[in-house]
Amino acid sequence: MKKKVTIVTIILFLLVIVGSFGKVTDFIINLEWFKEIGYTSVYFTKLAAILKLMIPIFIIIYTGLWFYYKSIRKIIIKWNKVVEVNVKTEKLKKRVAIVIDVIASFFVAYFTSSVYWYRILQFTSGNSFNIKDPIFNLDVSFYVFRLPLIESLYGVMLLFLIFMAVLTVILYIVLSLRDRVYNRNIGGINISFKEFFKGLSDFAGRQFAIISGLIMFLVAVGYAIRSFNLVYSPRGVVYGGGYTDIHVSLVFYVIIIAAAIVSSVVIFTSIIKYKIKPIFVSIVAILILIIGQSITAEIVQNLIVKSNEKNLEAPYIKNNIEYTRKAFNIDKLSESNFPSSDSLTQADIDSNRDTVNNIKVNSVTPALEFYNQVQVVRYYYDFRDLDVDRYNIGGKYSEVFLAPREIDSKSLEGNADTWQNRHLIYTHGYGLVMSKVNSVTSEGQPNFVIKDIPPQNSTNLKITNPRIYYGEETDDYAIANNTLGEFDYPDGSKNKTNNYDGKGGIKANILNRLIFAINKRDSNFLLSENITSNSKILINRNIMDRLNKIAPFLSYDKDPYVVLSGGKLFWIVDAYTTSDRFPYSQPYNNVNYIRNSVKVVIDAVDGTTNFYIVDKNDPIANSYSKIFPGLFKDVSQVPKDIRSHFKYPEDLFSTQCNVLGKYHVTDTGVFYNSEDLWETAKNQKQINGEKGVNDASYFIMRLPGENKSEMVLMEYFNMKDKDNMSAIFGARMDGNNYGKLILYKLPTDKTVYSPYLFKQKLNQDPSISKEVSLWNTQGSSVQFGDTSIIPIKNSLLYVEPVYLRAQGKNSMPEVKRVIVSFGNKMVMANSIDEALNQIFNNSSNNQSETRTETGGTSTDSSNNKDKLKQAQDLYNQAVDAQKNGDWSKYGDYINKLGKTLDELNK
């Protein structure tokens, strides 16, 4: 028998060991990986924090349960009137109780610590915001760093005490039922409440008194927490405590807190003394206060506040405006009135050439489509996204589109989808493609300055190692520097290969190969002859997965962008510190505080990942730096060239746009009346297409009043539910101006065209609409590009690229014209310079004036007939060229047709 028990024990032990292999290998691999990237301290900080929280919780829970068990055990022995205790049985019960206690305490402690480990670190390391809340005059750090942990521990303790109370009652009921079965004359279930209470008091009066008293004390703690949470109240006209919350609810909460503390003492003593009435009175009093608070608050809100809302809520509206603007970092933006006059001259254009020369004629979506059509080279390459950035090219500060050519191993299909191909051969992407935003080829396509494999580079930018081992599409592990050779790029009928020499990766020694084989359940790690001791196992290669594994407490921008610096590629990811605990701040997407305090730079070759704090005034980022020493570097350590590519992130800007639509108003009366609401401007991409939200765009421009051009992220605002433009919002990002926000408020006494109204205006222009309609015939379609509305001096210049796309699966949109508008003048030309020349130097020939002269000339009828026939012939020739795919001839015919139609209009 003993032998059988030993065998069973051994088998169970082996099963536990085998079952834990996965967790053990996970731990070893994580440890090796954190060591490889230099962040072992970060990994152990979390483990240490979990243990620091877990050990005291385990001790408290274990001790509480053990003393509870011992006291209840004595009561049960006494209850059962046991004269002589069986020592062996008692020892067994004690061992079972210890095992259950240990297991229960471990799970409670582990769950609590693994969920709330970060909150205790914030509690002890939180920095002051130096901002006081307007109700309790507490620093905001109390709400952001300390209150969350207090709430968490309160919830755990309340659940634990309720569990203990319920367990005590259940034990009493079970024993009572058992005794009734044996007809013992004691209080049971079908008896009066008074008898039940006395029986429970006899059974475990002291234990139940302590538990009940503590529960009532926690009721007081709960209402204290609820008082602090009034700064997040949604009751009034704005988010945060309003008139009713402060003058009614808070008063009741204070009374309930005092009553609950008194009741906890009353309940404790009453249970000991077998008195029901004081307990009943205490509980009823608390319930009356709770119900009374709710009813009184509703009465005051509906009968008093609503009829005097504007005056009574004014101070709380002011709080909401002030704290929301602070939380979303729009309280220090630079506001100015922009006249949007029609006073722009050719001299103004000439003095702002750096702005004009960087106006986009390319647009993001069609450019990315073209990149993926002509530059992927092989089917397993992919351009996931198009990034916008600025580079000094040939001595000129230029805005460019660029995209990294990543390898997508998921595209390997059929016989090509093998373990060797996925993990040993196709290990990395190669190179990037770059084009200037301000120029296109004669066919209307992006004009590449870097293209092809190996890179054909017509810029002064150095490219020495453009490989991409870490990126947005590298979702699988790779075993680099193997004997097969890693595919680099196609070279005619052969392939160039590369052997990885980066410092990233875990060494593929026999022990690590064994660990990975167990962890991945893949024997290839051990059996492959192509893996050597010099090979490197690259894991967590997807840059977003990588960041979330290193620093999951940060939020990350959804659009990482690639930078060419020092001949290599680097990824820059914007990281955010966020909170939903900022007092009086209106939440947007479940966040009511956000800062772009951290920039992350990742080497695309070796995966080196550096976190830089760029906002030293952010208390949350500073607390992270204290919690994780060694993780964050100072912004002064960023290489100068990399830093010059830092951009203001679109996700943050979009959030600030949403907030600014309402919170640009600081007057409480105007805010209450919703008199001046804005919304992000709408736009239209196709003729008769649906109206959609206009996307924010990056521009290189010289802002009015500035001496130097710079990159600015800009968005346009309309009046709510109207198409008249009301403001232009911008974020600066070059040099010391990084992060400065500007707001140009437009005149309210005249119509300023929004992107959508501008589209309607050009659609109503006879000459432009005629030509666009002609293009938009069967066999092709017209699409609009990104609308640019550029402030120059005191005026607005509108620019719209016009794309033409032929029907067909592989057709690509091509820029055929550029529409430029200023004031009441609008022209469509082959280039921006040509359009500006027509507007400012040849106003007698511009299309706006042509429109006013239409029908005002006297011409010979036969001459008109010749012109009409010529127009018809040109149209037919254009259609034929279009069908043949000869877009160059098509453009020539359309140009001639336009001139002929202009002559007919004279």
Curated annotation (Swiss-Prot):
Region Disordered: start-end pairs: 842-875
Cellular compartment(s): Cell membrane
Keyword Endoplasmic reticulum tagged: no
Membrane-spanning ranges: 7-29, 47-69, 96-118, 153-175, 208-230, 250-272, 279-301
Topological category with respect to the lipid bilayer: Multi-pass membrane protein
Keyword Nucleotide-binding: no
Pfam name, any one: UPF0182
Keywords on record: Cell membrane, Membrane, Transmembrane, Transmembrane helix
InterPro entries in the cross-refs: UPF0182
Biased composition annotated in UniProt, kind: Low complexity: 842-862
GO cellular component: extracellular region; plasma membrane
Family listed: Belongs to the UPF0182 family.
Protein known as: UPF0182 protein CA_C0010
